[in-house]
Protein backbone atom coordinates (compact mmCIF):
# COMPACT_ATOMS: atom_id res chain seq x y z
CA UNK A 1 0.00 0.00 0.00
CA UNK A 2 1.39 3.40 -0.97
CA UNK A 3 0.93 6.71 0.78
CA UNK A 4 -1.17 7.85 -2.14
CA UNK A 5 -3.48 4.84 -1.84
CA UNK A 6 -3.80 5.60 1.89
CA UNK A 7 -5.00 9.07 0.93
CA UNK A 8 -2.15 10.81 2.73
CA UNK A 9 -0.93 12.84 -0.23
CA UNK A 10 -2.02 13.98 -3.66
CA UNK A 11 1.61 14.60 -4.64
CA UNK A 12 3.67 12.00 -6.52
CA UNK A 13 5.38 9.42 -4.28
CA UNK A 14 8.99 9.75 -3.17
CA UNK A 15 11.87 7.35 -2.68
CA UNK A 16 14.74 8.75 -0.62
CA UNK A 17 17.53 6.43 -1.71
CA UNK A 18 20.08 7.72 0.80
CA UNK A 19 19.25 7.88 4.51
CA UNK A 20 21.51 6.82 7.38
CA UNK A 21 19.93 4.82 10.18
CA UNK A 22 22.70 3.05 12.01
CA UNK A 23 23.80 1.43 15.29
CA UNK A 24 25.08 4.60 16.92
CA UNK A 25 26.67 2.76 19.84
CA UNK A 26 29.20 1.27 17.40
CA UNK A 27 30.43 4.60 15.99
CA UNK A 28 33.82 5.93 17.00
CA UNK A 29 33.45 8.82 19.49
CA UNK A 30 35.07 11.39 17.18
CA UNK A 31 32.77 10.38 14.31
CA UNK A 32 29.69 10.41 16.53
CA UNK A 33 30.60 13.87 17.78
CA UNK A 34 30.65 15.14 14.20
CA UNK A 35 27.30 13.51 13.41
CA UNK A 36 25.63 15.00 16.49
CA UNK A 37 27.25 18.45 16.42
CA UNK A 38 24.78 21.31 16.21
CA UNK A 39 21.73 19.09 15.65
CA UNK A 40 18.39 19.53 17.40
CA UNK A 41 17.07 16.10 16.48
CA UNK A 42 19.66 13.84 18.09
CA UNK A 43 17.10 12.21 20.39
CA UNK A 44 14.90 11.42 17.39
CA UNK A 45 17.85 9.95 15.51
CA UNK A 46 18.53 7.58 18.40
CA UNK A 47 14.84 6.72 18.66
CA UNK A 48 14.63 5.79 14.99
CA UNK A 49 17.75 3.63 15.24
CA UNK A 50 16.15 1.68 18.07
CA UNK A 51 12.76 1.24 16.42
CA UNK A 52 12.01 0.70 12.75
CA UNK A 53 8.34 1.23 13.60
CA UNK A 54 9.11 4.77 14.79
CA UNK A 55 11.24 5.41 11.72
CA UNK A 56 8.42 4.32 9.44
CA UNK A 57 6.22 6.91 11.15
CA UNK A 58 8.92 9.47 10.39
CA UNK A 59 8.81 8.46 6.71
CA UNK A 60 5.02 8.75 6.73
CA UNK A 61 5.21 12.28 8.15
CA UNK A 62 7.69 13.23 5.42
CA UNK A 63 5.50 11.51 2.79
CA UNK A 64 8.37 9.24 1.77
CA UNK A 65 7.17 5.91 0.46
CA UNK A 66 10.48 4.01 0.51
CA UNK A 67 14.01 4.69 1.74
CA UNK A 68 17.49 3.31 1.18
CA UNK A 69 19.04 2.63 4.60
CA UNK A 70 22.77 3.07 4.08
CA UNK A 71 25.33 1.22 6.20
CA UNK A 72 28.85 0.07 5.44
CA UNK A 73 31.86 -1.60 7.05
CA UNK A 74 34.42 1.02 8.08
CA UNK A 75 36.46 -0.02 11.11
CA UNK A 76 39.20 2.53 10.43
CA UNK A 77 37.21 5.75 10.10
CA UNK A 78 33.64 5.24 11.35
CA UNK A 79 34.04 2.18 13.55
CA UNK A 80 31.61 -0.25 11.96
CA UNK A 81 32.62 -3.89 11.58
CA UNK A 82 30.94 -6.51 9.37
CA UNK A 83 28.25 -6.90 12.05
CA UNK A 84 26.63 -3.75 10.67
CA UNK A 85 25.39 -5.81 7.71
CA UNK A 86 23.36 -8.12 9.92
CA UNK A 87 22.11 -5.13 11.90
CA UNK A 88 20.73 -3.29 8.87
CA UNK A 89 19.24 -6.46 7.38
CA UNK A 90 17.37 -7.15 10.62
CA UNK A 91 16.30 -3.52 10.93
CA UNK A 92 14.87 -3.38 7.42
CA UNK A 93 13.10 -6.72 7.83
CA UNK A 94 10.44 -4.77 9.73
CA UNK A 95 9.14 -3.66 6.31
CA UNK A 96 11.40 -4.83 3.48
CA UNK A 97 9.14 -3.26 0.85
CA UNK A 98 9.66 0.24 2.23
CA UNK A 99 13.11 -0.12 3.79
CA UNK A 100 15.90 -0.95 1.33
CA UNK A 101 18.90 -2.32 3.21
CA UNK A 102 22.36 -1.34 1.97
CA UNK A 103 25.35 -3.19 3.42
CA UNK A 104 28.93 -3.64 2.33
CA UNK A 105 31.85 -5.97 1.81
CA UNK A 106 35.18 -4.47 2.87
CA UNK A 107 37.77 -6.01 0.52
CA UNK A 108 40.60 -5.46 2.99
CA UNK A 109 38.82 -7.32 5.81
CA UNK A 110 37.32 -10.31 4.01
CA UNK A 111 38.70 -13.61 2.76
CA UNK A 112 35.92 -14.66 0.36
CA UNK A 113 34.24 -11.50 -0.89
CA UNK A 114 32.06 -13.31 -3.43
CA UNK A 115 30.64 -15.63 -0.78
CA UNK A 116 29.89 -12.66 1.46
CA UNK A 117 28.01 -10.88 -1.33
CA UNK A 118 25.91 -14.00 -1.83
CA UNK A 119 25.25 -14.21 1.92
CA UNK A 120 24.16 -10.58 2.06
CA UNK A 121 21.82 -11.04 -0.88
CA UNK A 122 20.17 -13.98 0.88
CA UNK A 123 20.03 -11.93 4.07
CA UNK A 124 17.87 -9.33 2.36
CA UNK A 125 20.47 -6.71 1.45
CA UNK A 126 19.22 -4.79 -1.62
CA UNK A 127 22.40 -2.87 -2.46
CA UNK A 128 26.08 -2.66 -1.58
CA UNK A 129 27.84 0.50 -0.43
CA UNK A 130 31.45 1.29 -1.30
CA UNK A 131 32.80 4.28 0.61
CA UNK A 132 36.33 4.85 -0.70
CA UNK A 133 37.25 7.74 1.59
CA UNK A 134 36.06 5.88 4.71
CA UNK A 135 37.16 2.39 3.68
CA UNK A 136 40.52 3.68 2.45
CA UNK A 137 40.75 2.22 -1.03
CA UNK A 138 40.02 3.44 -4.54
CA UNK A 139 36.95 1.99 -6.28
CA UNK A 140 39.20 0.72 -9.08
CA UNK A 141 41.94 -0.66 -6.83
CA UNK A 142 41.21 -4.18 -8.08
CA UNK A 143 43.26 -3.16 -11.11
CA UNK A 144 46.33 -2.86 -8.89
CA UNK A 145 45.90 -6.09 -6.99
CA UNK A 146 42.98 -5.78 -4.55
CA UNK A 147 41.46 -9.08 -5.63
CA UNK A 148 38.53 -9.21 -3.18
CA UNK A 149 37.23 -5.93 -4.62
CA UNK A 150 37.08 -7.46 -8.09
CA UNK A 151 35.36 -10.54 -6.67
CA UNK A 152 32.80 -8.32 -4.96
CA UNK A 153 31.96 -6.46 -8.17
CA UNK A 154 31.80 -9.68 -10.18
CA UNK A 155 29.38 -11.36 -7.78
CA UNK A 156 27.26 -8.22 -7.42
CA UNK A 157 27.01 -8.03 -11.21
CA UNK A 158 26.08 -11.71 -11.37
CA UNK A 159 23.37 -11.30 -8.71
CA UNK A 160 22.06 -8.00 -10.12
CA UNK A 161 22.86 -6.26 -6.84
CA UNK A 162 23.36 -2.49 -7.31
CA UNK A 163 26.53 -0.93 -5.90
CA UNK A 164 26.47 2.60 -4.50
CA UNK A 165 29.89 4.29 -4.55
CA UNK A 166 30.47 7.38 -2.43
CA UNK A 167 31.86 10.23 -4.53
CA UNK A 168 32.85 13.61 -3.19
CA UNK A 169 34.47 14.93 -0.07
CA UNK A 170 34.08 13.84 3.54
CA UNK A 171 34.90 15.83 6.66
CA UNK A 172 35.04 12.85 9.02
CA UNK A 173 38.34 12.46 10.91
CA UNK A 174 40.66 10.10 9.05
CA UNK A 175 38.80 10.25 5.72
CA UNK A 176 41.00 10.11 2.61
CA UNK A 177 39.22 12.17 -0.02
CA UNK A 178 41.61 11.36 -2.85
CA UNK A 179 39.91 7.96 -3.15
CA UNK A 180 36.46 9.48 -3.71
CA UNK A 181 36.98 11.17 -7.07
CA UNK A 182 34.21 9.98 -9.42
CA UNK A 183 36.59 9.38 -12.33
CA UNK A 184 38.05 6.43 -10.40
CA UNK A 185 34.71 4.68 -10.91
CA UNK A 186 35.09 4.94 -14.69
CA UNK A 187 37.04 1.67 -14.68
CA UNK A 188 34.18 -0.02 -12.83
CA UNK A 189 31.77 1.02 -15.56
CA UNK A 190 34.14 -0.29 -18.23
CA UNK A 191 35.07 -3.58 -16.55
CA UNK A 192 31.60 -4.45 -15.21
CA UNK A 193 29.22 -3.04 -17.83
CA UNK A 194 26.17 -4.89 -16.51
CA UNK A 195 26.66 -3.79 -12.92
CA UNK A 196 24.33 -1.02 -11.76
CA UNK A 197 26.47 1.66 -10.12
CA UNK A 198 25.07 4.64 -8.23
CA UNK A 199 27.48 7.53 -7.67
CA UNK A 200 26.38 8.85 -4.29
CA UNK A 201 26.34 12.65 -3.91
CA UNK A 202 27.17 13.27 -7.58
CA UNK A 203 30.79 14.07 -6.70
CA UNK A 204 29.89 17.05 -4.55
CA UNK A 205 31.31 19.63 -4.09
CA UNK A 206 34.50 19.33 -6.16
CA UNK A 207 33.84 16.79 -8.91
CA UNK A 208 30.29 17.29 -10.21
CA UNK A 209 31.41 17.47 -13.85
CA UNK A 210 33.14 14.10 -13.55
CA UNK A 211 29.97 12.51 -12.17
CA UNK A 212 27.82 14.05 -14.90
CA UNK A 213 30.20 12.72 -17.57
CA UNK A 214 30.24 9.20 -16.13
CA UNK A 215 26.46 9.00 -15.85
CA UNK A 216 26.18 9.99 -19.50
CA UNK A 217 28.95 7.62 -20.59
CA UNK A 218 27.95 4.35 -18.91
CA UNK A 219 24.52 2.86 -19.54
CA UNK A 220 24.25 1.37 -16.04
CA UNK A 221 25.78 4.24 -14.08
CA UNK A 222 23.47 6.49 -12.09
CA UNK A 223 23.94 9.13 -9.43
CA UNK A 224 22.03 10.34 -6.41
CA UNK A 225 21.87 13.98 -5.35
CA UNK A 226 22.00 13.33 -1.62
CA UNK A 227 24.03 15.71 0.50
CA UNK A 228 23.63 18.52 -2.04
CA UNK A 229 21.54 21.47 -0.80
CA UNK A 230 18.49 21.27 -3.10
CA UNK A 231 18.71 24.96 -3.95
CA UNK A 232 22.21 24.26 -5.34
CA UNK A 233 21.26 21.32 -7.56
CA UNK A 234 20.62 23.38 -10.70
CA UNK A 235 23.78 25.40 -10.10
CA UNK A 236 25.87 22.24 -10.02
CA UNK A 237 23.88 20.31 -12.64
CA UNK A 238 22.29 22.86 -14.99
CA UNK A 239 21.70 20.09 -17.56
CA UNK A 240 20.18 17.66 -15.08
CA UNK A 241 17.14 17.08 -17.28
CA UNK A 242 19.43 15.48 -19.88
CA UNK A 243 20.15 12.69 -17.39
CA UNK A 244 16.78 12.69 -15.61
CA UNK A 245 16.42 8.96 -16.35
CA UNK A 246 19.55 8.27 -14.29
CA UNK A 247 19.31 10.55 -11.25
CA UNK A 248 17.93 9.42 -7.89
CA UNK A 249 16.64 11.64 -5.13
CA UNK A 250 18.27 11.30 -1.73
CA UNK A 251 18.85 13.48 1.31
CA UNK A 252 21.78 11.90 3.21
CA UNK A 253 19.87 12.68 6.41
CA UNK A 254 21.05 12.97 9.15
CA UNK A 255 24.50 13.56 7.72
CA UNK A 256 26.47 16.74 8.39
CA UNK A 257 24.85 19.70 6.68
CA UNK A 258 21.47 17.99 6.23
CA UNK A 259 19.10 19.49 8.83
CA UNK A 260 15.91 17.76 7.72
CA UNK A 261 14.08 15.68 5.13
CA UNK A 262 10.81 17.49 4.47
CA UNK A 263 12.58 20.79 3.82
CA UNK A 264 14.84 19.13 1.25
CA UNK A 265 11.86 17.65 -0.55
CA UNK A 266 10.01 20.97 -0.65
CA UNK A 267 13.06 22.82 -1.96
CA UNK A 268 13.68 20.20 -4.64
CA UNK A 269 10.07 20.36 -5.82
CA UNK A 270 10.42 24.15 -6.14
CA UNK A 271 13.28 23.82 -8.65
CA UNK A 272 12.63 24.76 -12.30
CA UNK A 273 12.73 21.14 -13.42
CA UNK A 274 10.01 19.74 -15.68
CA UNK A 275 7.39 17.71 -13.77
CA UNK A 276 8.14 14.58 -15.80
CA UNK A 277 11.84 14.85 -14.92
CA UNK A 278 11.03 15.46 -11.26
CA UNK A 279 8.85 12.36 -11.22
CA UNK A 280 11.71 10.27 -12.57
CA UNK A 281 14.20 11.65 -10.05
CA UNK A 282 11.92 11.53 -7.02
CA UNK A 283 10.51 8.06 -7.63
CA UNK A 284 10.54 6.29 -10.97
CA UNK A 285 14.26 5.66 -11.36
CA UNK A 286 14.73 4.19 -7.89
CA UNK A 287 11.54 2.16 -8.25
CA UNK A 288 12.91 0.67 -11.47
CA UNK A 289 16.27 -0.21 -9.89
CA UNK A 290 14.71 -1.58 -6.70
CA UNK A 291 11.42 -3.23 -7.64
CA UNK A 292 9.09 -4.38 -4.90
Q: PLM features: residue spans?
A:
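Active-site neighborhood of phospho(di)ester-bond hydrolases with catalytic His/Asp-centered motifs
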Residues: 14-17, 69-70, 102-104, 197-200, ...
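Mid-to-C-terminal alpha-helical segments outside catalytic/metal-binding sites
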Residues: 1-20, 26-66, 118, 243-246, ...
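Active-site environment of divalent metal-dependent phosphoester hydrolases
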Residues: 20-25, 74-77, 107-111, 134-137, ...
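Catalytic pocket-lining loop regions of alpha/beta-barrel enzymes
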Residues: 126-127, 141-248
